């Protein structure tokens, strides 16, 4: 018999009382007559009655829909995987859901975005100012003929201008796709050539670990191999713009200096408008490497991103409106999209552009301490670096505002768990999560209702019918099996780009167990409903 690992944390009575999960359970009791005394019963209901569960998420978190109440016709018109049809008749927009807080009298003048980079003074935007800059960029895109369905690609770092460009694109129904500027031209082109963008938002370089990296020649190389482009919006970062501007002029591409444009526009406030879209309208294209061939261009929708994002922020990560959310990420990783999506829940997002440990480990932790971050997201690799260097954040900065520490990207070791509670805080919920780019969601995550055992993930996420299957498709307990999801999630891909028969999409997830999503990880579910995730089963 396996030894049960020690419990490292349990929520206090005060933490539970203030949790959005407690508020949600109270909502279910008041509006549906449902009572849940533990997480397992809540999770079981969420996967047994998936229509009722997702309808409750829509209502409780106030999804903004222009359609008549309740904002849609039917929760789940078709339940098959792939091909589920969610919230038919909805009229929504991701950017509208994020920026609705700018119209809220208690939020409009509060801070929405705080950003720090290696070379710029710290910058902040209120909700009202963020919405105004989005409105100006929206007007720019519209003036260039950008419309619903056009692709807007970004070769950008983790800065507020990237957030604004995403929002402006989404507000029009254009489809966003981003890559980090430290990626090579071949890797970027392997992604963007597949989607034929009309617009490229880009930088001419970036700063990392005290060094300037000139990407102007790489950018011109990228431009040359994207014949679909009509517009280039450049954010000068190292001021190597002449060659880029010259190339755009020679080719007849519209060229806009983003810094000058926003500086001139910010003299007056504006309000963005929003195109009302169906639930399954494409929002962004993200990429996951296949075993062979080009990266998979995975299309996620406005609606699925909205309901999953609202659910996971509040009921998984335990973040309330007005709290502060930081995740160390680049624009080339799905966690950047998740960082931006925290705006939907009224969270202030914190962006750190550059090396998180330059000139020392205090850089990241001083930033989140100074701005009283309630959630800090880092990777197991970064935690491993801190362990190796014997760095203990609690000895250097005040982390009293920290409620949740997120970790994803790879399994977190037991030593990593111990480091969090010995070196960061004894009173923090460690949210070790797994899912990611492909489903646009976490299958395995956290709950403030449950204890945290050393080296183990807490739970199957609400609404996620996650199991560990043997080769014959039988669910396993206390044994390692294939991580699968047996019922559809609203955030699952709409399709892959340029995959008209959905063959590549089907072959990626549904060949081994028909009608069941096979994720490609090993998983063990114990009889305590606590999970351990192992290395990829496809490796």
Regions picked out by a protein language model, each given a short descriptive name:
Residues 315, 369, 403-529:
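Conserved AMP-binding/adenylate-forming
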């Amino acid at each position: 018999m396996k030894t049960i690992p020690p419990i490292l944390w349990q929520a206090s009575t005060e933490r539970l009382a203030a949790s959005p999960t407690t508020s949600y359970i109270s909502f279910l009791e008041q509006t549906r007559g449902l009572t849940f005394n533990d997480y397992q019963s809540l999770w079981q209901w969420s996967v047994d009655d998936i229509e009722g569960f997702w309808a409750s998420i829509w209502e409780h978190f106030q999804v903004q829909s222009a359609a008549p109440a309740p904002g849609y016709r039917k929760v789940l018109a078709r339940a098959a995987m792939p091909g589920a049809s969610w919230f038919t008749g909805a009229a929504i927009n991701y950017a509208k859901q994020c920026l609705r807080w700018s119209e809220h009298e208690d939020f409009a003048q509060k801070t929405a975005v705080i950003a720090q980079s290696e070379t710029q003074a710290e910058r902040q935007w209120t909700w009202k100012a963020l919405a105004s800059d989005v409105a100006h960029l929206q007007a720019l895109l519209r003036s260039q003929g950008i419309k619903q369905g056009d692709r807007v690609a970004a070769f950008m770092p983790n800065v507020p201008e990237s957030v604004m460009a995403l929002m402006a694109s989404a507000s029009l129904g254009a489809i966003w796709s981003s890559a980090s500027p430290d990626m090579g031209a071949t890797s970027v082109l392997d992604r963007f050539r597949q989607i034929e963008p009309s617009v490229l938002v880009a930088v001419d370089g970036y700063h990392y670990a005290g060094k300037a990296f000139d990407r102007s020649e790489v950018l011109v190389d990228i431009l040359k191999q994207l014949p679909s482009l009509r517009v280039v919006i450049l954010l000068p970062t190292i001021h190597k713009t002449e060659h880029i501007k010259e190339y755009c002029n020679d080719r007849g591409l519209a060229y806009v200096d983003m810094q000058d444009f926003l500086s001139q526009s910010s003299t007056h406030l504006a309000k963005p408008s929003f195109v009302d879209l169906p639930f399954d309208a494409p929002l962004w294209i993200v990429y996951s490497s296949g075993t062979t061939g080009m990266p998979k261009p995975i299309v996620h929708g406005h609606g699925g991103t909205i309901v999953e994002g609202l659910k996971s922020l509040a009921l998984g990560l335990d973040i309330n409106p007005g709290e502060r959310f930081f995740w160390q990420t680049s624009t080339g990783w799905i966690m950047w999209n998740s960082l931006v999506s925290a705006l939907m829940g009224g969270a202030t997002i914190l962006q750190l552009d550059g090396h998180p440990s330059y000139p020392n480990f205090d850089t990241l932790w001083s930033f989140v301490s100074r701005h009283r971050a309630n959630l800090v997201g880092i990777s197991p690799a970064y935690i491993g670096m801190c362990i190796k260097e014997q760095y203990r954040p609690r000895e250097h900065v005040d982390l009293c505002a920290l409620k949740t520490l997120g970790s994803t990207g790879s399994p977190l070791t037991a030593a990593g768990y111990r480091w969090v509670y010995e070196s960061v805080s004894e009173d923090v919920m460690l949210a070790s999560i797994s899912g990611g780019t492909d489903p646009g969601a976490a299958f395995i995550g956290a709950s403030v209702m449950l204890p945290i055992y050393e080296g183990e993930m807490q739970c199957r996420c609400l609404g996620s019918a996650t199991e560990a299957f043997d080769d014959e498709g039988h669910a396993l307990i206390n044994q390692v099996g294939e991580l699968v999801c047996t019922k559809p999630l609203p955030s699952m891909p709409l399709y892959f780009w340029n995959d008209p028969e959905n063959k590549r999409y089907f072959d990626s997830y549904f060949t081994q167990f028909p009608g069941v999503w096979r994720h490609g990880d090993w998983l063990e579910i114990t009889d305590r409903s606590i999970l351990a995730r192992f290395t990829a089963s496809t490796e």
